[in-house]
Every structure is written in C-alpha cells, then in structure tokens.
Amino acid sequence: MNPLQISTFYKLVICNINLNCYISRLGAATLFAATEARSCFPCFDEPNFKAIFALEVTVDQNLLVISNMPVMDSEKIDSRRKDTFEWSKEMSTYLVCIVIGQYDFIQTKANNRTLIRVFTPHGQREQGRFCLEVAKKSLEFFNQYFGKRYPLPKLDLVALNRLSVGAMENWGLITCRENAMIVDPNDSSPSTLRKVSLI
C-alpha cells in the first residue's frame, strides 16, 4: 500500500516572543470537522460511521508530531523521522487529528494513570499549567461521575495560534486557540480563568 500524502492542513505561524520579535516557523494542524476528512483520505465522512485509524507521519527531525494516539515507533530516515502511531479506537473520521510543529509541553497523570499533556509555543510552558490542572481535575471528575474510565492512554491539549473555531474535541488530542489555553493564573482576571476552564 502506498502512503497517503496528506494535504489538508491549517498553516500556523509559530512565534517566539522571548526575543521581543516574532520569528515565524511553519506548523500545521488538521481540522476535519464537519466533513473535511474526505479531502484527506477516502472515507464515509459521516459521524455515525466509525473506523480504526493507523497513522504514519514523516517530518523533519526538528518537528514534533502529535496525533490522537501515542507514538508507537520512530524511525530516522536521512534528515527526517517517521512516527508511527498506535491504532486508534473506533471513531468518526472528523475526529482524526495531526498537529506538526515546535512546542514545549508539560504533563501529569490522572488518578487512572491517563497521561495528560499541554503543548504550548516555546517559552510558554508555565502559562499552560492552569489548563493542565483543569484538564486533570475534569478528567478525574467525569471518570467518577460516569463510572467509566476514559478509554484512551493519553489526552493532549495543543495551543494553536490560528484556528477557525475556539476549540476542537478531537479524541485524545484537543486543539484550542492559544488565547483559550495559555494564561498566567497570577495575572489573569477571574473571567479569563473561567473561560479557560470551560474550554
């Protein structure tokens, strides 16, 4: 089987603000809601049809690739790297997500041992800590409330600087606008913290 060349990506500008200037680097993220998955791969692009996905993504070595499932294997190919992801659970096509870029991240584990990570632009890792704490508490609350364990091994939240929606609930990989995730809890209004906690 020939590898599929994905061409349905949001182009992102990833900026470094530590130098008091904006140094742009290219990043990419898919957004398949509501019916854009068909522009990337052949499928019945309807939410009631589910499929299991096995993804391989090849990128330059300096880029990070995040998808719905954890990376199962990485293989160096010249100056590039091929990341192979674990097979997904059955899910709707519009929930498949791939994010490529340069990010910092922080992580924790929920009491059910689910890995939770928040990815931020370089230099803003600590501004993602409030989001990480809210995600952990929320996951633990809903696990107990519904009496069911979150079924995936991880939950990633990625701050994107350009997104046509406020957030996207891709299974295992939630994408949000930066201003909906990145805050300084010591220097933010209660309404800003509330907004972040709702996303």
Mark where each language-model region is.
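Hydrophobic helix-coil surface modules that form long, contiguous segments used
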Residues: 30-37, 42-198
